[in-house]
Amino acid sequence: MPLYESSHEMDLTTVSLMHPDAADWFAKRTSAWRDWPLADLYDRKGDTRISVVLPALDEEPTVAEIVTGARTLMPLVDEVIVVDSGSVDRTAEVARQAGATVHHRDDILPGTGSRPGKGEVLWKALAVATGDILVYVDADLTDFRPHFVTGLLGPLLDDPATQMVKAFYDRPLLDVSAGGGGRVTELAARPLLNAYFPALAGVVQPLAGEYAARRSLLESLPFAAGYGVETGLLIDTYRTAGLDAVAQVDLGQRTHGHQDTAALGRMAATILHTIHARVTPGAPVWPTLTQFVRRTGTVTPADHPVAHPDRPPMTTIPGYQRPLA
């Protein structure tokens, strides 16, 4: 696997507080989309079948452009599927006109019923997608490029031991630093993963909606029904297949629709529940938070101690007396 440029520039003193497994993983399992030329992927595809899957809810303005872009990769990509989770706009119609195979969530495995949430749609997609590899792409992207797919496929087609590939990218938001994650990532998912699953601290954007995985892996894992699905799959892949089964790829820049603070609060609560359900009771808490900064075209870890001991109650301090007025 090609070495990500920042692994050569990394200041070892910067990562000394990072969990050693995470630091080692970041250095050897991170690459950039340019490391995976399209011609090389065609050579490595063989008889591997590849499905691009878009979960969609009211994404009429953006879904057709993404479908069209993904279809330019045929025959590397064998099918583009949109799973509609109950849109009230023309999402299904415009996706079908753009060439996607469209399924409604409620029509897939009807005997299981339908639950609300993104994870439900991704789970049901397994019952209609025919690929050996599934590439999930959010349907609200406003700047989709075909390399979003090819970058994620690269590590999977290069190494049979790779089971899941996560994307990371710049997010051009005024209140989000370049190279970091979104607000829910920085305020909820990253601190919790660093604390309870520190070996995953090297994952730049654990909530990225763009990722690819082998069907054999996805079929063996539970799917959180809501917005905790990405976090749950990441943790469960790590536990089931090991840290080196996961890779990540820098896709450059990504823009998409944004939600208000109240909606993000609900998302954060769902993710907290998903992570808490996977924490071993009594597990130690890692004392460092690893964040990421964009420098000269690459992303570099920045570590911060966060476990600061409490001061004791003042009444336990020898010689303490309340000052007189």
Per-region residue spans from a language model:
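Short aromatic/hydrophobic "clamp" motif used to bind/position activated sugar donors
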Residues: 134
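Conserved catalytic loops of nucleotide-sugar-dependent glycosyltransferases that act on lipid-linked
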Residues: 179-274
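Acceptor/aglycone-binding surface of glycosyltransferases and processive sugar-polymer synthases
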Residues: 110-118, 122-124, 144-217
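Short, acidic, metal-binding catalytic loop of nucleotide-sugar glycosyltransferases
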Residues: 68-77
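Conserved donor nucleotide-binding strand/loop of the catalytic core
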Residues: 78, 92-120, 128
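N-proximal low-complexity "stem/linker" segments adjacent to membrane-targeting elements
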Residues: 2-68
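A conserved acidic beta->alpha catalytic loop
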Residues: 84-93
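Terminal low-complexity segments of carbohydrate-biosynthetic enzymes
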Residues: 1-27, 259-325
